[in-house]
């Protein structure tokens, strides 16, 4: 067996463009390794409008393999759409491209590289890339700041906010910007939670700069002052007060003392729990009780006519032994991953939805499989074996139709995921959607996914058959450049809760297919729990004594 090559660290990339003529700029990052000719989408910056020299706050993290040649394909694009599929480069409005290697980047002084971006050999602007090697800690840090007697930059008061910068060989990099507090020279800012590696790259003694500004609606914001410190100094609590210094005022006034005082009224390291911490708690759980996080599963099966006549061997639903179709293989792969990777045995009956069938002489896009065989839900077997038994009984009786709609099933799944969910008994649900073509209710589906992002639910699409999917991949944050979906009334997806997998891409290697199915689940579950401020066994951060790490 070949040895798995592990990254030695992560590289954090920051970007700046110059001399750009297009109104809306964004950078998409692709990467390959070694002799691979395929560039994989890594991520994207935010979009910045109406700036010829945009500096992007969004950082892109890439695993760094010392022994491999890792080529970057950086694409500067212009767009003003809500969503784009960044995997389809030919559909993007390209400003220019740049193709360095990570090795070339980190070998430069200050790990800073400036180059020309080109479109069809024509220079269309410049790009500046700054790299930093960071070390993952698995922790977050919570900070809350209180200001006292800040300078009055307006007639009677100030509208203060602050920025945090971390030092680097190429200069300071911004890591956080707070919201503005109106008309208050004694502000108490909201608590902030930052990943420790983003704040200091894993170094507790790295210099941090806190800048305080007065916001103005018409003229430029005005600097109140700043101070420097490091994470260790903040957490130790030795320094109780940090004077804000405005160097310009200090040089002009002989009696100048400071422009205000800052206190850290809260500063703690928050251990970031893993999915295993939630499922197993203190090690005595099985993912199905004991006060730990329950894992619940729902399955939705495509019953549209594009599957083909289920009695024929050419049908995607043909499932006569020894033949095992892609629907069944996907179900078994999911069961295997839940048990082997997370120790979860599904001991409850799994709800099975169908969509795209004729029910009572009408197309139905949200029905329950047990109704097809006139069976009571409580008589069915638990787990995936129950799903397969129900599938084998129901599929021969179903009349397939069209179109393909799944939004109402996601709506129901969201509602089910919230049932019996509370802080003393956590539960997280998975909706597995097995589908053979793109959806026709895309906008409604986006709306429901946006709502589902606030619920304890992950949505996994597995595309079966030979269809080349177009719109479903755009629902997956990894495939659209980590752009959050936007639904009705400009409601925004708060986290990436969707994963799309095409079965045919893994038809040769079933092990890779199994590993891919639940690859995103750990981050999706822990991100939701972090959003809700829950710790394993239902404790919240405010209820838990967390030791400071020095």
UniProtKB/Swiss-Prot annotation:
CDD domains: C2A_Copine, C2B_Copine. One of its GO terms (molecular function) is calcium-dependent phospholipid binding. The keyword Transport does not apply. InterPro entries: C2_dom (IPR000008), C2_domain_sf (IPR035892), C2B_Copine (IPR037768), Copine (IPR045052), Copine_C (IPR010734), VWF_A (IPR002035), vWFA_dom_sf (IPR036465). Residues 296-521 form the VWFA domain. One of its GO terms (biological process) is cellular response to calcium ion. GO terms for cellular component: cytosol; nucleus; organelle membrane; plasma membrane. Residues 1-115, 123-246 form the C2 domain. Keywords: Repeat. Belongs to the copine family. This is Copine-F.
